[in-house]
Amino acid sequence: MAQTNGVLQEPAITTMNGAPVLKPASTQRIGNQLRATLLLQDINLLELIQHITHERIPERVVHARGTSAHGYFEVTDDISDVTSAAFLNRVGKQTDIFCRFSTVAGRAESAETVRDTRGFAFKMFTEEGNLDWLFLSTPVFPIRDGAKFPSFTHATKKNPRSGLPDHKAFWDYFTHNQEGIHFLMFLFSDRATPVDFQHADIFSINTYKFTKSDGSFTYVKIHLKTNQGVKNFTQDEANQKAGVDPDFQTRSLYEDIENQKYPTWDVFAQIIDPVKAENYHINIFDATKTFPFSEFPLRKFGKITLNRNVDNFFAEQEQSAFSPTNLVPGWALTPDPIIQTRALAYADTQRYRLGANFVQLPVNAPYKKPFTPLIRDGAATVNGNLGGTPNYFPSSFYNVGAATQYAQPDEEQFQGTVVNFESEVVDADYVQPRIFWEKTLAEEPGQQDNLISNVAGHLSAVTGDKGLGSSTSGLCNVR
């Protein structure tokens, strides 16, 4: 837009059908006075009021509080020996990305520096379609049985009667689901109060597969290490910042990018050979566990740089939609029960929030135009709907081009009886939490004391001897 004396010269304001509005702030009424009756024929007023009553969309169930940016992924090291993904096939190759960073439990306007896991979602616009990464700031997840996700979510949110934080429900949940103790210890360390998104490491949580065109595959976990250094608040610092500037982490990321202090992360793959995984003492599909770097070293293959803020917060950040089912050749899901559950939940919640055609929104649309003759119609179809192309397959009236041929990966072999399975907590579930306490935190001065203080502060809101005693039972099992 042109500027006059530093002021943008915009076109005249119009109604939604494009007709000019003479006085946008005026209303049609009988008589030139404030007490006069308004007229229903005032189209501008009708549009303004009817739109504002519909301009909000459903809030995300989790990860409601977030911020976004644009950037790119660059291949830094050759990794073509383990994956045929086209966006990884050449050192120096760059792929545009869009990211959304978030807290997990809080509502859309909640404070950002509170104790919580951070979500890191990346959408990569590759030449073979969009690849979505849905990662977290903790290397482990609180559950490994997908059916527990609703209970975990409810227990970490507010009381259904009072609408207030329910610390007793929180601790009661973890008392009965102690496979989450490893996650719980990360949550009450200073790692769960990062200064901002730029100063946090990022983890895939789930196990994925790298696949090759010859049908071979390896298992992989992804790690992103911040180049800004890891920086965390103490509980008191986080509380103070939440009260003074609840938008601090959004502001920090936005201002860094505006000031060309572009945040970057190095991207690593932790490769796990399928043969070794078969008999390894840790189930590679257990999201509550990590894998030692001494046996499965990190292998660098890329770098992420964020270098552009969004042009419109609602159109991009709020309407962005991510799903682990957004995959490309060379990258695949595994039987990890949590990633399988997430595969169902993410796309489904976006259809609820944004409608059946959320992928057509510019922030979500792949650079390569999809050809989906079997997926048509629905509210807000804006991509031409493939015109008169038959909406069934096969058809005598159009020829479908051949897709690039990829050998079907040699999948895991499964044989058994259908059962209702729920994992059980065993002694091995306390091994890694114990290592985290005795080694990881012990090597960082003051971190063991901070964890104890953070837990004690949270437990102080749990009333009743029974509630307090049962709440600490899981942590006592770590020692």
UniProtKB/Swiss-Prot annotation:
It is found in: Peroxisome matrix. Heme binds at Y346. One of its GO terms (biological process) is hydrogen peroxide catabolic process. Keywords: Heme, Hydrogen peroxide, Iron, Metal-binding, Oxidoreductase, Peroxidase, Peroxisome. One of its GO terms (cellular component) is peroxisomal matrix. It holds the Pfam family Catalase. One of its GO terms (molecular function) is metal ion binding. The keyword Iron applies. Its EC number is 1.11.1.6. It comes from the Eukaryota. PANTHER family: CATALASE. Belongs to the catalase family. This is Catalase A.
